[in-house]
UniProtKB/Swiss-Prot annotation:
The chain crosses the membrane at residues 10-30, 137-157, 160-180. The modification Phosphohistidine is found at residue 245. The gene is copS. GO terms for molecular function: ATP binding; phosphorelay sensor kinase activity. This is Sensor protein CopS. Keywords: ATP-binding, Cell inner membrane, Cell membrane, Copper, Kinase, Membrane, Nucleotide-binding, Phosphoprotein, Plasmid, Transferase, Transmembrane, Transmembrane helix, Two-component regulatory system. Its EC number is 2.7.13.3. Residues 31-136, 181-487 are cytoplasmic. It comes from Pseudomonas syringae pv. tomato. Residues 181-234 form the HAMP domain. SUPFAM superfamilies: ATPase domain of HSP90 chaperone/DNA topoisomerase II/histidine kinase (SSF55874), HAMP domain-like (SSF158472), Homodimeric domain of signal transducing histidine kinase (SSF47384).
Length: 487
């Protein structure tokens, strides 16, 4: 068994707990027993002293009768001795006769009773003044009780106690190991289930029944982790498949065109036209690769933003000029309102707004209007892009930031690689981090609408600043957190 095993630790804790309880109980029992015996001895000595005093009163002035009656009283107790001293220190009476006054140099007094050990024996004594019926001064009486049997009893009790403690420790260690082993069986089952899981079985979950309450939180968290891993693994698999598909198309086009041209000799104009077509495909392929590299860098925090003061109205006007001809061809009007200044990375802002505008143009019907409004709230700037469009199906809401994700699972050709809304989280990696995305549930929703992915949808993207705004502009900086999606 490993020293660091949980079973061993629980067993040791069980042993320590049992040993501590037994020691506390043993020490308490020992002290209470000693106090009880001490009280019994003091009571016995007190009763004998009262009897001696009563005999002294009843014997009158006859010393011999007094001594005889004291002898009768004390002689029946072999473990009890008595010495009566006159005021000058000479003995008046002793029983047994050879009894001497005890030396109190090493004696201690507890509860009015003297206690000491001598030559391996233990004694307790009580002293008092005894008055005689005659006019003579009172005597000093010493009653000494031999309690060696008590000392032997407690010595035996201690031996038994330590023996029982040792046996109980060994037994509790064995029982503690069995109890811990049995109690940790659910953990072993969880471990076996976790060990049996692989990339192909991430959909399995550890059942919560029958599981102790202490492990429910752990298993719930573990199952949640499996869910996240399964989702991430599926997204990664789909991402890899989509990358292969997106890269295969331009490469296949290049190879096909080249094979056709090389099949026979052709005029220089044909070669020039083919090279131009190949260059177009290469540019598309380069754009896809650049986009993937950009997103990979953003995921790893390798993009360092260059914050400059930007006039949002100027940014919107510039992008409107870029998309003006496309909007005219589709019969869509572009409308901008409001103005505000912010500190942000111009490339990031252009990239995000351009992506949103292109998606809005793609899914806005002819004759409709795309509205971009800028609202300066003093401490934050709100950028809204509104366009009419169909409602997002709820099951797609959690996937709006997935790269290459499309509502229609069927693949389609086009110039877009599907990276779309994944540009919005890029702002998080670029330190412009508080971009809230609102998703309207229906056409009557009062939230503004915004297209943010390469599929028919409605979204609202609003960059908010948590920092302090300077006069005339709002700063988006390091203290801002999160790119959130909420319905």
């Amino acid at each position: 068994m490993k020293p660091g095993s949980l079973t061993l630790r629980l067993s040791l804790l069980f042993v320590v707990a049992v040993a501590a309880v037994l020691i506390i109980v043993g020490v308490a029992f020992n002290e209470l027993s000693r106090h009880h015996f001490r009280a019994l001895d003091a009571q016995a000595l007190g009763e004998k002293l009262e009897a001696i005093t009563q005999i002294a009163k009843e014997s009158g002035a006859n010393p011999e009768l007094l001594k005889a009656r004291w002898h009768t009283l004390l002689g029946a107790h072999p473990d009890l001795s008595a010495v009566f001293l006159k005021t000058d220190g000479t003995p008046f009476f002793a029983e047994p006769p050879q009894s001497a006054v005890p030396s109190l140099a090493q004696a201690t007094q507890r509860d009015g009773v003297w206690e000491w050990e001598k030559e391996g024996r233990m004694f307790r004594a009580l002293t008092a003044s005894v008055s005689l019926p005659t006019a003579s001064p009172p005597l000093t009486a010493w009653l000494v009780l031999d309690v060696t049997t008590h000392m032997h009893f407690f010595a035996m009790l201690e031996r038994w106690f330590w023996g029982v403690l040792l046996a109980s420790t060994v037994l509790s260690a064995a029982l503690g190991w069995l109890v811990a082993k049995n109690g940790l069986r659910p953990v072993a089952r969880v471990t076996q289930t976790a060990a049996s899981m692989s990339a192909g079985s991430l959909k399995e979950r550890i059942p919560l029944e029958p599981v102790p309450d202490e492990l429910r939180a752990l298993i719930t968290a573990f199952n949640s982790m499996l869910g996240r891993l399964d989702d991430s693994f599926m997204r990664l698999s789909n991402f890899s498949a989509d990358i292969a598909h997106e890269l295969r198309t331009p490469i296949s086009n290049l190879r096909t065109h080249t094979e056709v041209i090389l099949a026979k000799k052709r005029a220089p104009e044909v070669y020039e036209e083919n090279l131009s077509s190949n260059l177009e495909e290469l540019n598309r392929l380069s754009g896809i690769i650049d986009g993937m590299l950009f997103l990979a860098k953003s995921d790893n925090g390798l993009i360092v933003p260059e914050a400059v003061e930007l006039d949002l109205r100027t940014v919107i006007s510039k992008l409107f000029g870029y998309y003006e001809f496309l909007a005219e061809d589709k019969g869509i009007q572009l409308q901008a309102s409001g103005n505000a200044s912010i500190f942000a990375d111009s490339v990031m802002i252009d990239r995000v707004v351009s992506n949103l505008l292109s998606n809005a143009l793609r899914y806005t019907s002819s004759g409709e209007t795309i509205k971009v409004s800028i609202h300066d709230h003093g401490g934050r700037v709100e950028l809204r892009l509104e366009n009419p469009g169909p409602e997002i199906v709820p099951q797609h809401l959690d996937r709006i930031f997935d790269r290459f994700y499309r509502v229609d699972p069927a693949r389609r050709e086009g110039r877009e690689c599907g990276a779309g809304a994944s540009d919005c989280p890029v702002l998080d990696a670029s330190a412009w981090r508080h971009y809230l995305v609102y998703i309207p549930r229906g056409p009557n929703d009062l939230h503004p609408h915004l297209h943010a992915i390469a599929c028919p949808t409605n979204l609202t993207c609003r960059p908010d600043s948590l920092g302090t705004a300077k006069p005339g502009h709002t700063r988006l900086g390091e203290h801002e957190t999160g790119c959130h999606c909420a319905g």
